[in-house]
Amino acid sequence: MKRTFQPNNRKRAKVHGFRARMKTKNGRNVLARRRLKGRHSLTVSSEK
């Protein structure tokens, strides 16, 4: 049986990236909460 996690950086950014989060109201809420919590990394695409 195939495993569920098949790594793919492009898909990762498209689904969980900063621009993907900014597209929706809820995504922006996620970013706001992570800022309030003081997360070291906001999204997977902000690793640079």
From Swiss-Prot:
It holds the Pfam family Ribosomal_L34. GO terms for cellular component: ribonucleoprotein complex; ribosome. It comes from Ureaplasma parvum serovar 3 (strain ATCC 700970). One of its GO terms (biological process) is translation. The keyword Chaperone does not apply. One of its GO terms (molecular function) is structural constituent of ribosome. This is Large ribosomal subunit protein bL34. PANTHER family: LARGE RIBOSOMAL SUBUNIT PROTEIN BL34M, MITOCHONDRIAL RIBOSOMAL PROTEIN 34 FAMILY MEMBER. Belongs to the bacterial ribosomal protein bL34 family. The gene is rpmH. Keywords: Ribonucleoprotein, Ribosomal protein. NCBIfam families: rpmH_bact (TIGR01030).
